[in-house]
A protein has these predicted regions:
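Beta-strand-rich binding/interaction modules
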Residues: 25, 222-223, 492-493, 506-601
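Hydrophobic helix-coil surface modules that form long, contiguous segments used
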Residues: 184-191, 199-359, 385
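Outer-membrane beta-barrel initiation region
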Residues: 544, 584-590, 601-701, 727-731, ...
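Outer-membrane beta-barrel "beta-signal"
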Residues: 952-955, 959, 997-1009
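Hydrophobic alpha-helical and helix-loop surface patches within well-folded domains
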Residues: 19-23, 34-35, 73, 256, ...
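A surface-exposed beta-strand-loop module
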Residues: 59, 96-172, 247-248, 576-593
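Short loop/turn motifs that connect adjacent beta-strands in outer-membrane beta-barrel proteins
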Residues: 631-635, 664-665, 699-707, 731-741, ...
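C-terminal outer-membrane beta-barrel translocator/porin domains of Gram-negative envelope proteins
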Residues: 643, 707-713, 722-726, 741-745, ...
């Protein structure tokens, strides 16, 4: 079809459609408003301001009389202290694109929309601007079936590109003109949609747009609408073979018409490349992008766009317009009628992925036009579901229709107890993470679950019928549900209620099974609050399989057999599971058979929160020498050999094991080592076993982020058994802006001095210690935060001991990659406190030293390493040089101490993958430890008992984090702690030895502030 003929037919359609729409009668239960816009704007590309006129004809097809109109003035959100700005700065997890950027906009960078004049049917009308909402008090109310003409003159300034709308993006695009004009608010059976703009979702009214845009002639425009004057414009829009006749002057006026759309968006740039493609028997595709080395994928995007439109037109329904434009814009990806804006510096997979997602919105949003502010899951979610299906088709990948990624994303949110119901207004979610899940994720999950509940064929028919029946009609969730019920023959109110109105978890369990003389008994339990039908695959000892299907009673029906999922496996349908019954008993008579394996939901289409109880025998995945990432479908265990050597402890041979379920739940760390003892003095009696076992379990009944850890450790002749309860305070636990951690630890410590290596013998008492440790930390105490510890203990069941410490640090970002940390710590303990708890400010306590895996792994190789190489265990206090031997250090271990530190850290090579792990340091510290009944028993400071003070420089390198070790670091505590440092204190107060310069060069291992 020629472009001329297409334009003629579109004009006929436009006139005919407008006539039919304007002639519709008011129907009490099935109506929608309609508008026509006639706008003329003139954009000054030097000032980034434009003047505009707008004639709006508003048709009231509702049964209500309207005495007010409401407009959105979106640009007003881009001003300091606007609601969008305040919300972005106060929310728990700000959108990184916004953050506090609006707050720092200058007068030339803000956005605004000023109404210069407004008339109702030619008469001045009273109006009021409330930030992003314009309230109009009509002179004459609009009766049902009536209309009003509003004439507006307005002035706008385009804000610096921050979110969706704006100018001069990070990729250099001049104008992304979205939410750019005074837009009439939506009105439906729920009333006016007048939420102030904070950067989230929208609700629009279908209408016809006639838009003229005048700007510098060097610019090219792309967007919504059909260009009416292509031969005056050219720039790739011209009709081939016809002469381009541009008007005189340095400006061009672009004239667009767009029938039956809910919005109008456009971009303008002076360096656009414009490529045009044609979908066979479909729309024309326009690609407008800034060509360059980082935009090469756009050359291939056109073919993918054509194929995507063809695929979706068949899968969902015909593409509803004659044009689709992919525009290189300023912010991520955003959908508008006939067009999408995407950032352009992407690889092909990313570019195709975002194009597909935004293209799908043409079906699920700009055509259906649900109220995104209330039902974002119906648009973003359905789009997300279809995106993976479409990209799999485009790239020839075999992929499941089940949105596993959405399942795992939402399960993570449930695990962190941050989920909010999907029926929450888009602006009212407490976190951006919950909003993202409630819009993008939940709708995708709805589709995945519907495919499981009623079958994939019925779901596909539902999608097609939903689009066909409800396009251009603003459907709501009930209308989608009714389509699904009609196509499936099932009752689904129960499903939509729990999926949309609650955050209930799905958790079904195989409790037990038994086989006796061919009689099979299986007990299933519903441990979660949410309901689901059950697919249960039974595998028998003779190699045969049987699918047991149990519908939910509330469905009042069953799904058809699914040969596309289960092949020829025979299906047995049992009586429905009543929602009032938490347990379901299965009894089958299968002569000569016994059960070898049972799997609940073998197709992985049910978003079960705990699949460890979905398979019997227990689903265990054993891997060799691999990091444990956590799996949804099984408990992962990784094992590897462990070998080491120490001069005093001898050879170590053993096994290291790690285990975890999804999200690091049910964490297991275990290591067992046979030690030979000193090889030079080897005796069979010296052979011993060291071990380190810990298991962490989430305590669901204690709220968010509560865990219990049980641990038993023994190495180098010292052991500890403990039970630790950790609870993060606050609604969001570990996700709080400033975390608050409360810990309670019961422990037993003991020592066998005959197995201690020499350096530990002097720092650890022989007697056993039973104790209780209580800790409370706010923030990250080693960076910015405070921590206090209270410890009570009983040594050898006789003397009582106790201690209290307080530590605080505050870190400032002085410049890029340069920080300054101010720290202080103070502690006091009873005079009877064990030796391993006593403080010397030049280094860690004996207990801390024993816990320093990296330090002992290195120093135990040879007993001379600490003295010959000046190797010490870091404690982050800045007084490390005083811990060296033979320097005459005045530091003593006491039951009281204080330290103060200033630590400057610079990472000059942050852009390099390896060198970014290096930091240069400048530090100063002072401190003192002493013995006394009370902390106030501070000793007299003199030459023989000086105050310790040090100033120096250093360099650190996080050796365990180099990329080559990324596979091994999660498996090794040694690598996790392996931070090496070289520190050179050039001033140290009060040294009393003959080798004070030896203290000026210290190699440190690990860092524990």
């Amino acid at each position: 079809m020629s472009t001329i003929l297409r334009s003629l037919l579109l004009s006929i359609f436009f006139v005919g459609f407008c006539t039919s729409v304007h002639a519709q009668e008011v129907v009490p239960n099935d109506w929608q408003q309609y508008v026509t816009y006639d706008m003329d704007i003139d954009l000054n590309v030097e000032t980034n301001r434009f003047n505009g006129t707008q004639k709006l004809v508003y048709h009231n097809y509702s049964p209500d009389t309207l005495d007010k109109l409401y407009y959105h003035l979106y640009f007003n959100a881009f001003q300091p202290n606007s609601m969008m700005d305040v919300r972005s700065r106060q929310i728990l997890d700000p959108d990184r694109r916004v953050g506090d950027r609006i707050f720092h906009l200058s007068e030339e960078e803000i956005g605004y929309q000023k109404v210069i004049s407004l008339k109702e049917n030619g008469r001045d009308v009273k109006y009021e601007v409330s930030e992003t909402i314009l309230i109009v008090e009509l002179n004459e109310p609009i009766p049902p079936g009536g209309q009003v003409t509003m004439d507006m003159v307005f002035e706008s300034q385009v804000p610096l590109q921050i979110r969706r709308s704006g100018r001069d993006s990070a990729e250099g695009i001049r104008y992304s003109m979205t939410q750019w004009y005074p837009r009439i608010a939506g009105y439906d059976r729920a009333g006016w949609s007048t939420s102030p703009y904070i950067g989230r979702e929208f609700h629009g009214t279908f209408g016809d747009f006639d838009v003229k845009i005048t700007l510098d002639s060097t610019y090219t425009i792309g967007g919504t609408g059909y260009l009416q004057n292509p031969q005056e414009i050219g720039k790739g829009y011209e009709i081939p073979g016809l002469e381009i006749k541009r008007p005189a002057g340095d400006k061009l006026t672009w004239h667009f018409k767009a029938p039956r759309v809910i919005d109008f968006a456009w971009t303008a740039h002076d360096k656009y490349t414009h490529d045009v493609y044609q979908v066979p028997n479909g729309p024309q595709v326009h690609l407008l992008y800034a060509d360059g080395p980082r935009s090469r994928a756009w050359k291939e995007l056109g073919d993918y766009t054509v194929r995507a439109i063809e695929f979706l037109s068949e899968y969902i329904g015909p593409y509803p317009y004659e044009q689709f434009s992919v525009l290189h814009g300023g912010d991520g990806g955003m959908e508008y009628p006939m067009a999408t804006l995407v950032t352009g510096h992407r690889n092909l997979n990313s570019l195709v992925g975002v194009m597909v997602h935004e293209l799908l919105h043409i079906w699920f949003q700009t055509s259906l036009a649900t109220d995104e502010s209330k039902y974002a899951w119906m648009d973003e979610g359905f789009t997300s579901y279809m995106s993976s299906i479409t990209t799999n088709h485009l790239f020839g990948r075999q992929g499941s229709t089940t949105p596993i990624g959405s399942y795992l994303g939402y399960l993570s949110l449930l695990n962190d107890e941050m989920a909010e119901p999907a029926n929450t207004h888009s602006d009212r979610y407490n976190t951006n993470r919950a909003y993202s899940a409630g819009s993008y994720t939940i709708g995708s999950i709805v589709m995945g679950h519907l495919g499981y509940i009623m079958g994939q064929d019925a779901l596909k028919r539902t999608i097609q019928r939903y689009f066909d029946e409800w396009k251009f009609r603003h459907p709501n969730p009930m209308e989608f549900r009714r389509v699904a019920e009609k196509e499936s023959g099932l009752q689904l109110e129960w499903f939509f209620d729990q999926q949309i109105n609650t955050t209930k978890k799905i958790d079904y369990s195989i409790e037990k099974y038994r086989t006796s003389n061919g009689n099979l008994q299986i007990t299933l339990a519903r441990k979660g609050e949410a309901l689901m039908p059950v697919d249960l695959l039974v595998q028998y000892n003779d190699g045969t399989r049987e699918l047991i299907y149990i519908p939910i009673h509330l469905m009042l029906g069953s799904k058809p057999e699914e040969s596309d999922i289960y092949g020829e496996t025979p299906r047995t349908t049992l009586s429905p599971w009543r929602w009032t019954d938490p347990v379901y008993e299965i009894q089958l008579n299968r002569p000569g058979k016994s059960i070898s394996e049972i799997t609940l939901d073998p197709s992985l289409r049910m978003m079960d929160a705990n699949r460890m109880n979905n398979t019997r025998p227990f689903p265990l995945d054993l891997t060799f020498a691999q990091p444990v990432r956590g799996s949804w479908n099984e408990y992962q265990v990784s094992y590897r050999p462990a070998i080491w050597y120490g001069q005093e402890s001898g050879f170590h041979f053993g096994l290291s094991t790690q285990g975890s379920y999804m999200f690091n739940n049910n964490r297991l760390d275990a290591g067992f080592m046979i030690t030979t003892g000193d090889v030079d003095q080897y005796e069979i009696s010296n052979v011993d076993v060291d071990y380190n076992i810990s298991y962490t379990h989430k305590l669901k009944h204690f709220g968010n982020a509560a865990t219990a850890e049980i641990s038993a450790r023994r190495f180098y002749g010292i052991g500890e058994e403990s039970l630790t309860l950790n609870k993060y305070i606050g609604q969001y636990g570990t996700r709080e802006p400033i975390t608050r951690l409360l810990s309670l630890k019961l422990f037993h410590q003991y020592s066998n001095n005959d197995r201690n290596i020499a350096m530990l013998q002097s720092q650890w008492d022989d007697a056993s210690v039973f104790g209780l440790k209580m800790s409370y930390a706010v923030g990250n105490p080693s960076v910015t935060g405070v921590k206090t510890d209270l410890v009570f203990g009983s040594q050898a069941r006789q003397s009582a001991a106790g201690l209290a410490t307080f530590t605080a640090n505050k870190t400032y970002d002085v410049a890029p990659n340069l920080t300054t940390r101010f720290g202080m710590s103070v502690g006091t303990g009873s005079e009877s406190m064990p030796t391993q708890w006593r403080w010397a400010v030049s280094g860690p306590t004996g207990e801390q030293l024993w816990n320093n895996t990296a330090y002992w792994a290195i120093n135990n190789i040879d007993a001379s390493i600490p003295t010959d190489l000046n190797v010490l265990a870091n404690d982050g206090g800045g007084l490390i040089g005083y811990g060296l031997m033979d320097v005459g250090s005045p530091d003593i271990a006491g039951n009281n101490y204080f330290t103060g530190t200033i630590w400057n850290t610079w990472q000059p090579f942050s852009g390099n993958r390896v060198l970014r792990l290096m930091a240069l340091e400048l530090f100063a510290a002072t401190g003192k430890s002493w013995n006394g009944t009370y902390i106030s028993d501070f000793p007299e400071i003199n030459e023989s008992n000086p105050l310790l003070a040090s100033i120096g420089t250093g360099v650190t390198f996080d050796l365990g984090s180099i990329p080559a070790l990324s596979r091994w670091k999660p498996q090794s505590k040694l690598l996790q702690e392996l931070q090496l440092s070289v520190r050179m204190p050039f001033f140290m107060n009060g040294l009393q030895g003959y080798d004070d310069w030896g203290a000026r060069f210290v190699i440190g291992v690990s860092e524990s502030f």
